[in-house]
Amino acid sequence: VLNIIQQLFEGYYSVFDAKALGSSSNSFALEAFKSNPLVAIQHDGDLSRIEDNTRLNSLVSHELMTVNEKFKSTYSNRFKCFLFMGTNKPVKITDAKSGLIRRLIDVSPSGNKLNPREYKAIMKQIEFELGAIAYHCQEIYLNNPGLYDDYIPIAMLGASNDFYNFIIDSYHVFKREN
């Protein structure tokens, strides 16, 4: 899917390092966004151990940020970029009020698989279907633009937030004592 998104946004995407965005020590983490891409993609990222979510929160909130590129003067920029990250590990959400929860959409595979021959045949046709794919995505969005306004990534919270799990496990005890 990420390869298809790259093809749809050819010339308007960049690749990024999610781990660098969540690290307080990497001063060049925003360098990947210097071309101000519409879409940023990381095929195999890791946000399971976010040291400092300040930079990531500011990026997904489209706030004015200071960019430090190697061998250049620092400058300020506001990035309006949609981030896609593939990962096998849950995102560690450290601050429920940070806004990351409101902006994160956790997508899991459906489990519907094609046999290898069908997969190869379909993948060969993707390039010729990009216009139809883009149109379909636009139509789905326009039919219900607010679909994810109240979305909360419950599965991701359950996989990475110990306090959330404690409350879920103890809810009936608290309710009984109340």
Question: Which residues are covered by each model-predicted region?
Answer:
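Feature primarily recognizes SF3-like P-loop helicase cores of small DNA viruses
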Residues: 1-178
